[in-house]
UniProtKB/Swiss-Prot annotation:
Belongs to the GART family. It catalyses: N(1)-(5-phospho-beta-D-ribosyl)glycinamide + (6R)-10-formyltetrahydrofolate = N(2)-formyl-N(1)-(5-phospho-beta-D-ribosyl)glycinamide + (6S)-5,6,7,8-tetrahydrofolate + H(+). It is an enzyme of class 2 (transferase). Catalyzes the transfer of a formyl group from 10-formyltetrahydrofolate to 5-phospho-ribosyl-glycinamide (GAR), producing 5-phospho-ribosyl-N-formylglycinamide (FGAR) and tetrahydrofolate. This is Phosphoribosylglycinamide formyltransferase. GO terms for biological process: 'de novo' IMP biosynthetic process. Its EC number is 2.1.2.2. It comes from Staphylococcus aureus (strain MRSA252). Pathway: Purine metabolism; IMP biosynthesis via de novo pathway; N(2)-formyl-N(1)-(5-phospho-D-ribosyl)glycinamide from N(1)-(5-phospho-D-ribosyl)glycinamide (10-formyl THF route): step 1/1. The keyword Lyase does not apply. Keywords: Purine biosynthesis, Transferase. Pfam families: Formyl_trans_N (PF00551). The record marks 146 as: Raises pKa of active site His. N(1)-(5-phospho-beta-D-ribosyl)glycinamide binds at residues 12-14.
């Protein structure tokens, strides 16, 4: 059994999708040890409780520095014998302490065809760009924002009559297929 921790900051829909794939047996030999969140009111907490997944709520402002925050996370991760970190809507850059402790073992999913539209509101950026395609990317995490080595991408059309909300749903659907597929191939 490979132990993974999932980090999320918001609604946690990708978190829940991964958990459901584990529970159904579609993702084999994986144990989700806990949800790590940096927001005490994040909806992902409710999703974790629904699936009886332990939750660690650690707000960076509780710590004197980013290094202290990350060292605390590393301690918790090591106590749970976590082997991989899966970012699922975690809205913080990963710093040197986590990167050093989990080198090559942190994955992220981003709602664009990287290297295009890094950072926040990637779907909105694609929607307003005039592009005719967008998609989702799973990549290894490095010290930059959405700059790690790309593992796999899936794409969808941006139709002239799509609303931003419709495009968000298309990309979310891609993510729900792509992330578990990549996790199954990579996390061993």
């Amino acid at each position: 059994m490979v132990k993974i921790a999932i980090f999320a900051s918001g609604s946690g829909s990708n978190f829940e999708n991964i958990v459901e794939h584990v529970e159904s047996g579609k993702l084999e030999n994986i144990e989700v040890t806990a949800l790590y969140t940096d927001h005490q009111n994040a909806f992902c907490i409710d999703r974790a409780k629904k699936h009886d997944i332990p939750v660690y709520i650690n707000e960076p402002k509780q710590f004197g520095s980013k290094a202290a925050y990350e060292q605390h996370l590393v301690t918790l991760l090591n106590e749970d014998k976590v082997e991989w970190i899966i970012l699922a809507g975690y809205m913080r850059l990963i710093g040197p302490d986590l990167l050093a402790s989990f080198e090559g073992k942190i994955l992220n999913i981003h709602p664009s065809l990287l290297p295009k539209y890094k950072g926040i509101d990637a779907i909105g950026q694609a929607y307003h760009s005039g592009d005719t395609i967008t998609g989702s990317t799973v990549h290894y995490v490095d010290s930059g924002m959405d700059t790690g080595e790309i593992i796999e991408q899936r794409q969808c059309d941006i139709r002239p009559d799509d609303s931003k909300e419709q495009l968000e749903e298309k990309v979310k659907k891609l993510e729900y297929e792509l992330y578990p597929s990549v996790i199954a191939k990579i996390v061993k």
